[in-house]
């Protein structure tokens, strides 16, 4: 009996040895979480500040089929860091940009970088992400580190409702100063299940970065609203920090309300260098030109929109709008806009009340009519306003 006793004693030890080492991080969504919003980011919180590597893969799999649903290749740079040189062939489009669409293209059904308008395809030299149906795509950071937290940004619209997923992260994608993190394998079982179905109504949508609302991101809520809806939708953004690139087009009758200027902040590190206009097409000289991609928050070809009680900011300098508006009957109440050059681009009919605006030269750019009431505007040098209003358009009124 003694040999049998020894064998039985050894089996638990061998089983323990086969278990993967703990990932040494707090995970969000938590392992085994249910009712997760499909627009969730993947978040790892460590005890020390992680370093993002320049190689390795992040993959997310469907649990049932074990097929890869999305992947991020860290060997691809996030985006340009130096300005482009444009040739004489770069000019404004001679035909109006076409905003019509029968459905919103996503990364699931369209190759990021697919050209629209008169643009050429966006080269795949950098990370590309279709946001808000803009198929030409945006450069983006697949991982952003703040203090000891690493947030992974999947390509938009890749996860679905009523599905289970698991995540793997190659060793070297993230490292810690003490080298105690070696990635996450399938055996670590970082898995979660999304909500069974979409929100029952578009009347009111709650955005909460902690996953307690209908969506985790502002973009997720905007994508859910049908184009040119005749029914009003209220998006309530809970207090928190929302680091995301926001682009919406063809949205109407939407109220976007935060919890206060000092409590709800939507921001991203974007500018003309990181997301430049196409090599052969200029942007924003007159209505109908190719849309700009350089702002942190963009409402394009939108009307009857109200923004209230939040801060919108870009985290970069240069030609860098915090907020870019292109549409009619857009109102801002108690909104703090922070940008650099062209901090606010206002095209169309815009009303501002009790707002704050901080920027650099050309603090306000656009083809307004902009009417500002009881609002404060500050810049750190250079022209305050560069209005390119056309005949019959009165420009900006303060």
Question: In which residue ranges do the predicted regions lie?
Answer:
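Acidic, low-complexity Ser/Thr/Gly/Pro-rich repeat segments typical of extracellular/periplasmic
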Residues: 20-199
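Sec-dependent N-terminal signal peptides
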Residues: 6-8
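Sequence-level preference for short, compositionally simple segments enriched
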Residues: 195-212, 216-398
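C-terminal motif of bacterial Sec signal peptides marking the signal peptidase cleavage site
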Residues: 13-16
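Positively charged n-region of N-terminal signal peptides that target proteins for export
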Residues: 1-4
